[in-house]
């Protein structure tokens, strides 16, 4: 699509979203567009520090978890000693960026609003790790905590998965992986999905939206995919193109959140319509005036805080 034909997104977003877009961090250098992936990861971590400030304090523990690929770092957020369930959180970042620090505030707020233990899994990034390594690491971490639940004093009888953007894909893919391979890690009570991608290769929103402001041009999306997948055949895997999986049965209750001006919005709409058509428990909510990744900005955006509360409320309602 010719860029001039796209919607003038920055003129259409909400006032609070514009405030975020126009917020400058004077001590921060410009984005290293031509830098190495290591430099871009470092920048992303530095840039997110401002947005992570002021998060709720709670008991926090870090553990290294064994997987067949090596040790994976996890971080537990425990808002109360008697948690009714455990939520595994998978951060976004296009499979190539992000870590437990970049999404710290999101995980803390989710733990606070749900009063459930939240476990962030620092899966290995791409291109160092190729599909399906991240999913296998997530599943290994779930199995580890299920087996060691008493030692770590966590409730693994009921669990959930949550994630934003690429992390949303990983969240749902991990839940489907456990179902399909009949791996018991506790009952999956719900899956919380904020503005994820689930397998579409083209859509109306991908044509009309996406630009330098969100890093989601068609070229950007292709770059993330090429970094994540091992080969062309992986594009059709039911754990990458989730629409190629069986979404007609035994899908855990899904909270599906969409951002109005997100090029990935049609992925969320299609996922919701597919699940609803087959009587799978799900809820879709569109957040007006928002861009992709708005969940990070709860320091300034009431809508971001609302979206986290909505997800937490959906999850606790399933318990």
UniProtKB/Swiss-Prot annotation:
Active site (catalytic residues): 165, 262, 292
Record's subcellular location: Cytoplasm
Top enzyme category: hydrolase
Listed InterPro entries: AB_hydrolase_3, AB_hydrolase_fold, Acetyl_esterase, GDXG_lipolytic_enzyme, Lipase_GDXG_HIS_AS, Lipase_GDXG_put_SER_AS
Keyword ATP-binding listed: no
Family indicated by similarity: Belongs to the 'GDXG' lipolytic enzyme family.
E.C. no: 3.1.1.-
Record note on quaternary structure: Homodimer. Interacts with MalT and MelA.
Domain of life: Bacteria
Designated name of the protein: Acetyl esterase
GO function terms (MF aspect): carboxylic ester hydrolase activity
Origin species: Shigella sonnei (strain Ss046)
Motif Involved in the stabilization of the negatively charged intermediate by the formation of the oxyanion hole: where in chain: 91-93
UniProt-listed Gene3D superfamilies: alpha/beta hydrolase
Assigned keywords, A-Z: Cytoplasm, Hydrolase, Serine esterase
Function: Displays esterase activity towards short chain fatty esters (acyl chain length of up to 8 carbons). Able to hydrolyze triacetylglycerol (triacetin) and tributyrylglycerol (tributyrin), but not trioleylglycerol (triolein) or cholesterol oleate. Negatively regulates MalT activity by antagonizing maltotriose binding. Inhibits MelA galactosidase activity.
HAMAP family linked to this entry: Acetyl_esterase
GO cellular component: cytoplasm
UniProt xrefs under NCBIfam families: PRK10162.1
